[in-house]
Amino acid sequence: MSKFQNLLRSAVLAAIVIGAAFLCGLRLLEIQIADGSKYLAMTQSTHTATQDIEAARGKIADSTGKILNTNELNCSVKLQKASLESGTENEVIYRILTILMKHGDEWNETLPITRTQPYQFEKDRDNAVDSLKSRMKLGVYATVENCMNALYENYKISDQYEEPMRRCIAGVRYEMELKGFNNNNPYELASGISSDTVLELKELSALMPGMEISEGWNRVYLDGTTAPHIRGTVGAISADKYAELKSAGYKLDDIIGTSGIELALESTLRGERGTREITRNSDGMMISDEITKEPQAGKSVMLTIDSNFQNMVERIVQYHMDFLHSPYYTTAMDANLRGKDTEVGSAVVLDVRDGSVLAMATLPSYDINQLVEDYASVLNAENSPLLNRAINGEYRPGSTFKTITATAGLAEGVIDASSTINCTGRYMYYAPSYTPGCTGVHGSITVQFGLKHSCNIFFYETARRMCIDRLAYWANKFGVGTDLGFELPMSTGRMTSPELFDKLGIEWNASDTIQAGIGQSETLLTPLHLATQAMTIANKGVRYRPHIVKAVYNYDYTKLIEEIKPEVMADFSEGMEDVFAEVHAGMKRVSENANFLMEGGWYNIYDFKGIGKENVCTKTGTPEVIAMTKFNSTIVGFYPADNPEIAFGVCMENSEYSRHVACNIISAYITGEFNPVYDEDGNAVYPLGEKRKTADAEQH
């Protein structure tokens, strides 16, 4: 080949190379400059999701500032539908469950099928099983195997996942469906996860697009046995409640108050959610996390109760029942051992100066934390511990009602301070068809001694002279049969009347008026009504709204938002000074009769405890529950007699000597102590909880 040809070939080859390089350069220039933004977007495609930030729920504290219900930080795993690519759900769930299992963390699912083979329907979950079959479009006789196969097919869970992981994935998918998983409603797969789990999930988050770690709050109940009925609990929102509250901004995964103050003050305690925007690239890696709206914590509440006094009153009620059960309660004290089968009791203490609840005991009770962990065990426990008898137990008031009859009779003028009614032991006005008896033969007595001896005849006649309409009119002023305005849902009770009898389908007789006059017939009151009655008498006709909330604060109690002011519900004090002077004097005389066998002698219980019988106004009752066979024991009263500070109402079911409960409540209020005494076998030893006589205790 000639030299010229070689040069020509080299030139052509060089031209080709240069041309190719030029074309490549042009293309590179086009990519980098002309279409650079296009390809940058392709390599950095992003997705931004909005995530809620849970707000802390307000706290609940007692009157001293002791925290009762509070929060602790809770990390949870959530799935966001907008970030979860269709068809990858099972693999993402598999990866998350693997990490949860590795660190011993639980997850949320309620599939009514056991998690281990051989699979079985869970016991006592018939409704859930029926719902599962219906959702899977299976017949009522479908087996557990039919259900599992339907779940696998419905959610496309292949057999590449071994059992029982395959079943666990199915459980999560089913729960996601139940919870309405969608772009606006993330699914909380697990909550309360450990720090190790959080760390590993974050490290491997790129492999689990749609998975997010969320920080929220768990409700914590401190000292769970203190006033559980008052404080209440929170729980997951139900479908019905969600439908009701959706317009108020609630979501399906929200936690709401379910009982007590948690429920009653839901709108106060609930915070306002915040939001954050999380941006991820096409690989699922987080690019940015920006809070667009800060969450607002809920307001905190301070109650009127002092935990120490509340616990003392609960122990006092329990101790009284324990003593009536014990071998130290002898026939020398009570020939018939009345009350020995008592199991249930309640007591309410009010501040007469503003109506605030100082203590509200109801027994049997429970531990809130046990309720949260094992609801069924508390629900099914003997004597219904979930029932707040202090506000929802309805009882005949018995002779405690005679204080109302006395007030009404004096105010109506059918009796006065010097009026006497002759008690022969039998009321003869309706003879011979109806001749109800009395507890004794008291002779000719005034209203003060009518109260002291609890003379049925005196109050039969007083009620008859008034007629039922006027008696009911005055009873209403004391709150009988009315809504007291209390924060928690409660019974209104009821007052005997012809209208009530008509509703109950009972024939009304004129003689029913006299039974109403002694707190029998169809009159029913709660212990809070009894305490309110006593407060109204102590205040000589002024009835405050009983309330359990003292104040509302910001979240950390550093700023007072609202202080609850006393609210007068009824005021009939004008011109009633002389009327209440007689009623007070009669109630003092009742306290003079409060004697019991202690340490070998009969002592006045109020003197024995150093209170002084002259300082206490009380009225006891023994209302019939079953005619002449079963009785409750009630008492209303206030202390001190002349300048009252507290009022109380007590009802002990199937019991006796509720005055012992009242005496110990007053003593605990004065001293800040209650000292129960039990022997080595757990028997309550002394009637009033201690073997201590004061210098004022005199034998009677």
Q: Where are the regions that the model predicts?
A:
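Short helix-capping/linker segments at secondary-structure and domain boundaries
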Residues: G104, G235-A243, G413-I415, N539-R545, ...
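Membrane-proximal periplasmic segments of bacterial cell-envelope enzymes
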Residues: M1-P295, Q318-S346, V352
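Short, gly/Ser/Thr-rich active-site loops of penicillin-recognizing serine hydrolases
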Residues: I561-I564, V661-H700
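Beta-lactam-recognizing serine transpeptidase/beta-lactamase-like catalytic domain environment
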Residues: I67-N69, C75, T279-T292, I305, ...
